[in-house]
């Protein structure tokens, strides 16, 4: 489908405001400036009145969309616009909540690529347009030339104009091209499942799709959670016939290091926890060549910890890579590790989603395959998020 998409970005100073729009299909740019040296307000307003389609931004929902809406509706002075911009930067939501979501532009919708990363990942990785520009191999990565409190000279205005028009827009366009398949997937999900998700990360899409199915059985599902004062691991550990071995372990930097899995299993059976941070175990395994492999265990899975080595195939040894297909969903379904407050409906919904994905893969239905994959991969982690309706920490630990 041929959609009109515009990459865009703004800069705001006490005596300078500029915005650049770039046609995502043709690459053509439109630059507008309102400053102490030039006033293109009328031209910008005319452009906006005829503009339609999607505005592609990086953090636009939390900044650019709001600034543009305020400017368009209130026709502020540059000083008033800068003061408003500061309130947005400082997250004074009472001052700007009326201007969110491009409500004054009914023919425009926002696509915020920043939100394609989950909120926790955005914070922990400190994701920025500049850092992504480096990863994408853009030739010039530059910070804003002057602090946003600076009163710009005309020469400085030219620098900021070039920074906005050239580098920021080029990196944003490059990022859009890199994420184009993900953008198109969200368009397909919106059309097929009738949910709004064009600026959602994968976990949010998973929540909306699962919620759509759960709501048929539990209308008030969004308010439900399963809270537990403690989790006895003996109640959720699966039976396993280990070969009996010596119980050997030590404590190293708050981690329990076990000599074998028999020791790990028996220590876990004795433990009662309240949070997942209490699970910190390692197992040391001997390799046939006399070396050792250390496996770290936590709620995030099993991770091998090894020093850097070069491994080569020989006449007697080959290197093989194995992957367990749909490990988490199969573990959840086979053992019914499902949120207690959604029992039994979640099992049926989740099982149906897994089967729909397998069917889509066989039939090469890429949209359904990718959509169901988002739901499947997102569900496990969401069970550990107390702010969403899937929350039941015991199921995260059990899985």
Give residue spans per PLM region.
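A generic structural motif
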Residues: 20-24
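Conserved acidic
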Residues: 1, 6, 13, 25-62, ...
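Short N-terminal binding/cap micro-motifs at the start of the first secondary-structure element
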Residues: 14-19
